[in-house]
C-alpha cells in the first residue's frame, strides 16, 4: 500500500507521537543510568515539513552542531539523528570520559573533537538511539536493526542533507518525530530526530491496529 | 546593503542586477550557481539527487541535477539572460559521514551529484568555470548578482571566493 503524508489523520499523528514518547522515555532512562545524571525531556512533536522549510524548523542551515547519525532497517526502516550544540557535545563527552568540563568557552566555540571524544559521543548516541528503537520494537512487535553510529561536527544543513537525500527519492516532504533532552543541571540541550521512511508508517500503524 | 535571497533545499531562484543568492549548509547536495555577466542575471539551485529518472515522485524539478539546470535556465532567460553568456560555478557534494559498513546506496551520493551536475551543464553547453566540491565538510555559498562572484564558507576549512 502506498502512503502519503496527506493521508495521515490527527489520530495517526497522535499514535506516532505516543510511540515517540515510549521510545524517548526509554532512551532518557538509559542515558540517565549511563551518566548518573538527571535527564529531562519534552513531549515529542511530530512535524511534517517541505525540504526547503526544514532548516527553519530545526535552526539555521549554517549553525555549527555535533551530530550522531544512524540508519535502521528490518521490518521498518529510517534514519535517526542526535544533534547537540558543540558546547553541550564537548561537556557530554567529558562527562562520559571523566575529563574536565569546559565552562569558560562560548557556545560558538569550535576546536574540533578528538577521536576519543568523537567515539564517546558515538557511543552515547548509540545507546540513546538503540534504547529508543528497542522500546518501539517491543511495543509494535516489529524487528528493527540499527546500523553503526557515525559522528560529525559541521553545519546543521550539511548533516541533515544525509537523511533528507534518502527521503528525496520518494517524497517532497519529510515527517520526523522530535524530542528535546536536557541533561543534568548544566542544561546541555539536544534534539533527537527520528525519520522513518515513507513505507514504514503504514507498517507501524498496521502493527498497532490503527489502520 | 545588498538584499539576500535564501534558496532552500530542493529549491531554485534567480535575481537580476544586484543582491545575493545564498544557500546555507550544503552537505552532499550541490549548489549550482549560474551567471550571465552581460545582463547580471544570477541563478542558484540547491539539488539533492543526481537524476529524476526511475523516481516516481519527480515533479519538483529543483530536487534533481538533470532537471534543475533546465528550469533555472528558463527562469533566467525570462529575466533577459542570454544563454551564450551564462557560466556555471558549483559547490558541495561532500560525504558527511565516512560509512564503514556495507556499500550503502548513499555512498558517494555527493560525488554522483557533482558528476550529474557537470554532465547536465555540458548538455546545455554551459561551461563550468569554477568548482569547490567533495571533502567531508559542509559549505554555505553566496552568489553576488553584481559581479558573479561565489563566496564559499566552511567551518574549519576556510573561506574562498570562486
Predicted regions mapped to residue ranges:
Chain A
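Composition-driven recognition of glycine/serine/threonine/acidic- and proline-rich low-complexity segments
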Residues: 2-26, 30-211
